[in-house]
């Protein structure tokens, strides 16, 4: 999952540095992530993981760090699994 998140951030995040240079806790907005790039990344994540970000997750905090993105994706995947069961 983390490799996919990092790849999508590299492709869509328009960061000022390579994602490989960022720790999982680094501030993505400090690294150059804009609101527009966050939305582009969110759409790519939705497609890659077959999830949909609810309005409640459309917050700056959801994309504050790689770990924050991972937490959102994990929560959405867990919710989808519960609905499928």
Where are these regions (language model features)?
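Phosphopantetheine-dependent thiolation modules in NRPS/PKS and related acyl-activating systems
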Residues: 1-43, 47-85
């Amino acid at each position: 999952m983390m490799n996919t998140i990092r790849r999508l951030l590299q492709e869509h995040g328009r960061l000022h540095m390579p994602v490989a240079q960022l720790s999982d806790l680094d501030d993505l907005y400090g690294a150059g992530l804009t609101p527009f790039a966050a939305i582009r990344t969110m759409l790519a994540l939705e497609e890659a993981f077959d999830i949909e970000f609810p309005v409640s997750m459309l917050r700056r905090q959801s994309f504050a760090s790689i770990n924050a993105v991972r937490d959102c994706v994990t929560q959405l995947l867990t919710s989808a699994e519960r609905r499928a069961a």
